[in-house]
Amino acid sequence: MDIEKRILELREILNYHSHKYYVEDAPEISDFEYDELYRELEKLEQERPDLITPDSPTQRIGGKPLEGFKKVVHAVQMQSLSDVFSREELLAFDRRVREAVGDDVEYVVEKKIDGLSVSLVYENGVFTRGATRGDGLVGEDVTQNLKTIRTIPLRLKRDLPLLEVRGEVFISKKDFIKINEEQEAAGQQLFANPRNAAAGSLRQLDPKVTSQRKLDIFVFNIQRIEGQSFKTHSETLEFLKELGFKTSPGYKVCKDINAVWEEINRIGEERGEIDFEIDGAVVKVNSLEQREILGSTIKAPRWAVAYKYPAEVKETVVKKITVNVGRTGVLTPIAIFDPVRLAGSTVSRATLHNMDYIKEKDIRIGDTVRIRKAGDIIPEVVDVVFEKRSGNEAEFNMPEQCPVCGADVVREEGEAAYRCTGIECSAQLYRKIVHFASRDAMNIEGLGPAIIEVLLEKGLIKEIADLYYLHKEKETLVNIERMGKKSVENLLASIEKSKQNNIDRLIFGFGIRHIGLRAAQLLSENFESLDALMNASAEDIMAIPEFGEKMAKSVEQFFRQKQNRDTVEKLKAAGVNTVSFGKKKIKDNRFEGKTFVLTGTLPSFTRKEAEEIIKSFGGKTSGSVSKKTDYVLAGEDAGSKLQKAKELGIEIIDEDKFRKMIE
């Protein structure tokens, strides 16, 4: 096989299907088939690293966390827009435009996406740099994080010498809700709105975290270009589509300001139904020649304005407070109130987040409350109208048993969240199975989120253990759209293979609160079987030096639940290993008691590979340099850690020295 030819072919195939899926929303192959092609490319590139290029689909997610963001001076200033808040102000803008360029003016109206503005630079058709807007003159280099956004092409469909475009990075309303559910489940601070979530995700130092946040982008302007010219803005938008960009959705060319006003009203009526947050409508002069005449002020162009929609607040009465159990097991109180029309839709419920939120606002059943839509998306209770309180209102208390499965509900000290402890609670099953099948848990290849959703929808799995009985449903699986015989055979083989895992993977796969990979390994090393662990008390578990009371009680609480014990029995009946392989022996402990810190890029090791080698010799790794650090392993572009090591007199080694140490 000609490896170079096959690599080029695979890149072309993967780029085509990625565009069909992420930009056009019209997939032609299954997720499993895409993953198999991706893995083939990954394998070939590992064999021939000299053929890896920056625009390869495998290079979207960087291998190592960054130590900071470099500053970028924008070649073209990224200006903001002047705001208008009424029809009168819009008409005044139109008068100023016509006074400067005459009455023959055409406008383009676009939705104003409420996200984070970025610039993307392409050289000879390849994405080379991306930066945040910053103050408009200087931004931050976030190239590696932008590469994780699937709707940003790494290579254009035309090899233009130079192209710089501007776009808005955002998170859809649906994904924003999921992210906040995950934040809440992890006991972390919630994002106030999708814009904050997008900004926080794009500025993560670890691109792998960014890649999990489902960021998206709409590209809406050409900042500079070589090898092409245009007469109108609408022409540039169509050209950007041809290059492979996802552009401003549903823009409209308007012949006069009255048509502009009609379009603004239409967008305003529909904004509650759009799956991304908008904070207005942008009105732009279409003619690029007229734009040149109009020019700009220091901060904003004279040829465009942003119309901002007014916020709505309504009063209603809380009829009852129910409890929703999320995919992570967190119980969330929901206020049910008299239906009201708000921001384009009728709403009758709003999340109350947790008991701390309810107590802080003193919300009671029967209260008159004021509500609004945060960012025109999520209904929220602003406050209680205390002057309308009658004295007959009732306080709300969180249930002690899960309303879905009946398992115990617990609230750990220092946390706001109440959680269901049942592993097979149907409300949280999807997330549990995704985690159970993940690489660090049972490592079931081919069982990704999309396949799991299908299996749940078809009723083929109702609990984790059902995965190991799927072979009985082979004919049904083969007939499911986008799966096929080969995909099903591979999936079933992977499930069968996972039965032989050590129990540390199974323990981690259960998703027990506070039990990560290392904790699961320690439990496996200290208990000979899952039965022994299930019958252990918190005191028994705390005999492991690394285990504190919180971790030990979490394990005890988990295995105390009958449904969790039943799951273990069903797994055993299916042939899943529940006996420990014993403590992993370190053959060579030359690094015992030594702590390493890694910084920069190593020529031939990934950071994870180097860390695993250090641990295999009994050493430890740390993310920061201190007096307790023994060695700093430094590669190219080493950052502040290297400087701190020099200041503290820590021994600094390069890859060559490291190789000699492990020979």
UniProtKB/Swiss-Prot annotation:
Cysteines joined through disulfide linkages: none
Database matches in InterPro entries: BRCT_dom, BRCT_dom_sf, DisA/LigA_HHH, DNA_ligase, DNA_ligase_AS, DNAligase_adenylation, DNAligase_N, Hlx-hairpin-Hlx_DNA-bd_motif
UniProt: Zn(2+) binding residues: C402, C405, C420, C425
A Pfam family this chain is assigned to: BRCT
Keyword Iron-sulfur: no
Cofactor(s) listed in the protein's UniProt record: Mg(2+); Mn(2+)
Catalytic-site annotation from UniProt: K112 (n6-amp-lysine intermediate)
Domain called BRCT: residue spans: 586-663
E.C. numbers: 6.5.1.2
Gene Ontology process terms (BP): DNA repair; DNA replication
UniProt keyword terms in alphabetical order: DNA damage, DNA repair, DNA replication, Ligase, Magnesium, Manganese, Metal-binding, NAD, Zinc
Single Gene Ontology MF annotation: metal ion binding
HAMAP family xrefs: DNA_ligase_A
PANTHER family: CHROMOSOME TRANSMISSION FIDELITY FACTOR 18 (PTHR23389), REPLICATION FACTOR C SUBUNIT 1 (PTHR23389:SF6)
Family: Belongs to the NAD-dependent DNA ligase family. LigA subfamily.
Role this protein plays: DNA ligase that catalyzes the formation of phosphodiester linkages between 5'-phosphoryl and 3'-hydroxyl groups in double-stranded DNA using NAD as a coenzyme and as the energy source for the reaction. It is essential for DNA replication and repair of damaged DNA.
The name this protein goes by in its record: DNA ligase
